[in-house]
From Swiss-Prot:
This is Putative septation protein SpoVG. It comes from Lachnospira eligens (strain ATCC 27750 / DSM 3376 / VPI C15-48 / C15-B4) (Eubacterium eligens). It comes from the Bacteria. PANTHER family: SEPTATION PROTEIN SPOVG-RELATED. InterPro entries: SpoVG, SpoVG_sf. Keywords: Cell cycle, Cell division, Septation. GO terms for biological process: division septum assembly; sporulation resulting in formation of a cellular spore. The keyword Signal does not apply. Disulfide bonds: none annotated. Could be involved in septation. The gene is spoVG. Belongs to the SpoVG family.
Amino acid sequence: MNITDVRVRKIAKEGKMRAVVSITIDDEFVVHDIKVIEGEKGLFIAMPSRKSSDGEYRDIAHPINTQTRDKLQKIVLEAYEKAEYVEE
């Protein structure tokens, strides 16, 4: 799996969410709405999710192993650090 494109939209509002990211995998598959969150231990990514009928949030798409999650987080956070704020 190769991440062939990362698009970052930084958020300049108050709160813990810092950006919304879209990634392209192998120039063939796009995942939208990955969030960059500021946590107590630093930045991390949250995969796109949906609120279920019981009020819990469930990931729509996510890596199935730690190695892939770590790789994805590293790539997304590196792109986040390089991105500039865009005024809306």
